[in-house]
C-alpha cells in the first residue's frame, strides 16, 4: 500500500508551489499568470439547512438552487438532511444524481454526522461506527463524489484519543480506498478543532485517501453546549490542516458594510489556503443569524470572488 508520505512526494513534482503569504490583501489574483481561477467555489448544503428542515426548500432542489440561483456548479451534501429519505442508498440517491447531472452540477462530497464515534474507546462501538459509514462511502461513489467528511470524535486523554481516532479512521479509509473515496476529517469541536492534534492524527493514519476539510470557523475546543469558551487560533489551525486538505469550507456568519466577514479575515485565510498549493473547490457554508440563507450564500460568494478576482 502506498502511504500518504509516498503519495505526497510524487505529487510534489506537479504542485503549483505558488507562495502568496507575503502578498497584500488586494493581490491574490496577481499570483495567477493564467486565466484559470485560483480556486473554484462550491456550495455546502448546510447553508440551506434551516429551509430544508422547515420544508420550505425541498431537498431535491439543492442542485437546482446552486446552479440556477448562484451559478455554482459543484455541491457538498449533508447526510443529516436526507438520511431519513434515503438511508444512504436506493432510488432517492439515484434521483439526486439524475437531478445534479441534468443541471450540470458536480457532487463533491457528503458530510456525515450521527454515525458514532470513530475514536470510541470501546472497540466494538468503534467498529460499529466505522461500518455505519460504509453506506455513505457507497452513496458518495454512486453520486460521483471524491470524499465523505467524517468526525474524529473520541473520549479520554489527548494521546489516547489520537490513537483511537487514527485506528477508526484507518479502518474506514481502507474501505474508502477500495471504492476510490477519500475519508476527510473536519475540525468540528473538541480535539478535532486543535490543529496540532488533528494533523497528528493524519500523520498516524498516513494514507493518501485520508485527509482533512479545514473549516474557517469551527475552532471551538469544547462541546456543542459550551462552545465559545475556548477557541483555537483559526489561522494557525487552517495552516496546520492544509497539508492534508482535500476540501475547504468557507464558514461565514456576519458581514460588515464592506462585505467582509466579521469573524474571519478572508484575505488572510485564503492566502494560507493558496500558499499550501490548494487549487480545488472552496465551499460556501453560511450559517449566520442576520441574513437569510439565500442572501448569506450570495454575500459569501461575493466575498470569495472579491478575494479571488
Walk through the language-model features, giving the residues of each.
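C-terminal segment of N-terminal export signals and the immediately downstream linker at the start
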Residues: 23-53
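N-terminal export signals
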Residues: 8-28
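Twin-arginine (Tat) signal peptide motif
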Residues: 1-8
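Conserved, mostly hydrophobic/aromatic
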Residues: 43, 66, 100, 140, ...
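Acidic/histidine-rich catalytic cores of soluble enzymes
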Residues: 74-75, 170-271
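Structural motif corresponding to the early beta-alpha repeats
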Residues: 72-170, 177-182, 208, 218, ...
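Short, acidic/polar
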Residues: 53-68, 127-138, 230-238, 266
